[in-house]
């Protein structure tokens, strides 16, 4: 599977007609923000009267490697489901640019255009789509919401999805395993990200229990994150934890070299952080999460299921991704590092720094 990483300045529109499991009219193509058209993913044969046709809005909160990976996995799995169940599906992709106003505009449009289902990717996108769809029966199947309860996405009749909830204690144990006797850990995150709230609380609780001091720094933009990273370096921390925080993920390529130069190990809540230079990423398999999200969509559209029949899913946390060149630049022995990590993970993979998965 190929994953693409890009910083979008406009909404992304793609229509992909896929053979697949009556019919609804195609939604209008208007939007309150600029959009561009991407090539179709695949060409579908002519629709017969018996073929059901569904129109799905995929609303990505912003562009970065993790969310791109999820979106592509969703589309690939829905392609397979379409072929297996005999329905036809068209997609329209929207990008909210991590902007609440843009996401609200998208929400108003997709609800007005009466899509058969909406797939928001990440917490803010999900919250905006749920608000926009309030009072309608439009199915909303979110992907990668770290804490659905905190985000206010539970107990809503037309809403379900997948969660990338993080096992924070496991990551903190990785830090301690690689740094026996460590007495201070940095926490780098965006205060406005719901996806970070519980994980940061868990990290603080872990540190308090184990007699470890914490140094917290925050940022809401890439520039602020760079300053926060510099402040952590100035504070003398040797290890930093970041959860599944979209703001920090977007800035990772801008800060990883500073951490390397200062001898700081960055431990993070997703493999895409590691791809972008952080020493360690830990968490769920985002391809698996995207596939599970697509499966929920096909069950809702084709199998007569309702969101109430499909409670939100969580996944095993256990995959460690090590950026080999970062670990080596920090003077760490890769074999020894893997041995130290083994008790706290189910799998260890390696990557080298890049903008996107390939």
Language-model segments: which ranges?
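An alpha-beta-alpha
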Residues: 56, 74, 164-210, 306, ...
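Beta-alpha junction/loop-to-helix N-cap segments that form part of ligand/metal-binding clefts
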Residues: 93-153, 245-260, 264-269
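Hydrophobic alpha-helical segments within soluble ligand-binding/sensing domains
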Residues: 148-155, 160-184, 284-305
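Pocket-lining segment of extracytoplasmic ligand-binding domains
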Residues: 194-270
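Hinge/cleft segment of the Venus flytrap/periplasmic-binding protein
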Residues: 299-358
């Amino acid at each position: 599977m190929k994953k693409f990483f890009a910083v979008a300045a406009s909404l992304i529109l793609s229509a992909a007609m896929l053979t697949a499991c009556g019919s609804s009219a195609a939604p209008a193509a208007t939007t309150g923000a600029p959009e561009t058209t991407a090539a179709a993913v695949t060409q579908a044969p002519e629709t017969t009267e018996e073929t059901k046709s569904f129109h799905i809005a995929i609303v990505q909160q912003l562009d970065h490697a993790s969310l791109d990976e999820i979106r592509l996995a969703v589309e690939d799995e829905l392609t397979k489901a379409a072929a297996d169940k005999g329905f036809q599906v068209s997609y329209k992709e929207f990008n909210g640019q991590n902007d609440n106003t843009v996401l609200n505009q998208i929400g108003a449009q997709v609800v007005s255009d009466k899509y058969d289902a909406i797939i928001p990717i990440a917490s803010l996108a999900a919250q905006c789509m749920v608000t926009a769809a309030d009072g309608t029966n439009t199915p909303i199947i979110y992907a990668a919401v770290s804490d659905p309860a905190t985000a206010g996405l539970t107990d809503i009749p037309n809403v379900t999805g997948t969660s990338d909830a993080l096992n924070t204690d496991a990551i903190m144990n990785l830090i301690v395993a690689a740094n026996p006797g460590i007495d201070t850990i940095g926490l780098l995150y965006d205060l406005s990200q719901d996806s970070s709230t519980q994980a940061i609380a868990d990290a603080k609780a872990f540190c308090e229990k184990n007699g470890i001091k914490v140094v917290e720094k925050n940022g809401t933009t890439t520039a602020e994150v760079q300053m926060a990273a510099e402040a952590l370096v100035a504070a003398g921390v040797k290890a930093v934890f970041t959860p599944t925080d979209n703001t920090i993920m977007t800035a990772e390529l801008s800060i990883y070299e500073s951490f390397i130069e200062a001898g700081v190990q960055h431990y993070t809540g997703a493999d895409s952080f590691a791809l972008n230079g952080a020493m360690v990423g830990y968490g769920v398999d985002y391809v698996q999460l995207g596939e599970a999200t697509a499966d929920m969509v096909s069950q809702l559209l084709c199998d007569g299921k309702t969101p109430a029949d499909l409670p939100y899913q969580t996944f095993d946390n256990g995959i460690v991704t090590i950026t080999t060149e970062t670990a080596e630049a920090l003077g760490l022995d890769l074999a020894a590092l893997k041995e130290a990590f083994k008790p706290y993970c189910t799998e260890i993979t390696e990557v080298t720094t890049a903008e996107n998965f390939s």
